[in-house]
Amino acid sequence: MTSGFIIATLAIIVYSLWVRRDTWWTRWEVTATCAVAMEGCALLLMSPWAAPTVGVMLHQALGVWNVQQMLGHLCLIAAVSGNIYHMLVRLADPEQVKVLMRRQLMVPIWLGVAIMVPAFVLADQDYLPDFFSAPSANSLMIVYAVTGSAVVLYLSTYVSRLMLTLRQDPRAKTTIDLYLVSMGFAAAATTTVVASAWVEGDDAGPVIWACVCLSIGIFSYGSARSWRAKSAWFSPATAR
C-alpha cells in the first residue's frame, strides 16, 4: 500500500512540474515550483526504494546509516520554507520579506537543523529500509523526531496563517483551501511521528506515509491548478 501511495504522489508531482514548467523563469512563481520539486526529492529520499541504493552509497561515504532519510526530512523543511516565501511576496515588499524570513524563519530552522543533524549522526542507527515503519526508542532519535516535527509544525502554522489572509481573495480561495488541507495532513503526519517515537513496532508507518503522501499530493495538485488558472488569463481565448 505504501508503494502505491508513493507512486501516485510522484505522478502528481511530475504532472504539477510539467504544468508549471514555464514558471522556472517567473520571479513570482519559481519558489512555489521549487517547493514542489523539493517535495518530490524528499519523497524519493524517504521512500524504502532509496535505502538499498542511495542509503548504501551514503553509508560507504559517511559511515552513517539512513542519511538519505535525514536529507529527505531536510528537503521537506526547505519545501515548506519555499512555499512561505511564495506566500509572503504576495503580501509584502520583497525587501520586507527578506527581513521577515531572516527574523521569523531562519533562526528556528537553523536551530532545528543544528540539533537534528548531530542527534541523527550520534544515534548510530542500524540499517532501516523504512524509517517511518521502524521508529526507534533511542533517546537521540526521539530528540531528532521531536525537533524535526516541531520545526515542521511551526512552519506549517506560519504558512497556514498566511494562507488564511490570502484566502480573502475569491480568485485564490479554492487553491488556498487545497493548501490548507495539505497542511492539515502535514500536521497529522508530524504528530504521529512524535507519538510513534516512544513506541516500539511498525503500526504507525502506514498512517504516516498516507498523511505524508496526501499532504504532498494535494499541495502539488493545488500548485498545478493555481498556475493553470493564472496562465489562463493570458491565453488568446481569455484575451478575447
Predicted regions and their residues:
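Membrane-interface interhelical loops and short amphipathic "cap" helices
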Residues: 51-65, 125-140, 196-206
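Membrane-proximal helix-loop-helix units in multi-pass membrane proteins
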Residues: 91-156
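Internal transmembrane alpha-helix with an interfacial aromatic "cap," most often the third helix
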Residues: 15-18, 68-106
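Generic alpha-helical transmembrane segments
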Residues: 5-10, 76-80, 142-161, 214-218
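C-terminal transmembrane-bundle signature of multipass membrane proteins
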Residues: 150-240
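Membrane-interfacial loop-to-transmembrane alpha-helix junctions, especially the N-terminal start
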Residues: 24-37, 100-106, 171-182, 204-211
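C-terminal TM-helix exit segments that contain a strictly Trp-centered aromatic cap at the helix terminus
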Residues: 43-46, 114-124, 189-194
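Membrane-proximal first intracellular loop
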Residues: 1-69, 172
